[in-house]
Amino acid sequence: MAASVPWFTERYTPHDVRSHQLKKVLVRSQTRFQKAVLADTYSFGRCLILNDEIQSAEKDEFIYHECLVQPAMALHPRPRDILILGGGEGATVREILRHPRVRRVTMVDIDGDRKSVV
């Protein structure tokens, strides 16, 4: 592997890591709460990396967010006004807004600066 090729290595345990070759780093930022990197990868598409851990990947984030949101939305008789605690990347909001009965979504995240990265 060429030394000039950018790689991101994520540590899963003290004994296990996974490395991802980056196509391009789009944004690097440091907020009061976290270090954020938005990068395009070859295997997972665009990734949001927070504090050196992949938070979300374009290729498979829908699996997590659909499973998080859709059961609650299906079970609630009239989901209209929704409060999301966290969810700064916006995928939870996207899933909620698929439901026509929703009239208002409020999202509160500890790190308001992260929206400018995502």
Label the predicted regions.
Residues 1-47:
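N-terminal auxiliary segments of SAM/dcSAM-dependent transferases
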Residues 2-8, 56-118:
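The AdoMet/dcAdoMet-binding core of the Class I SAM-like
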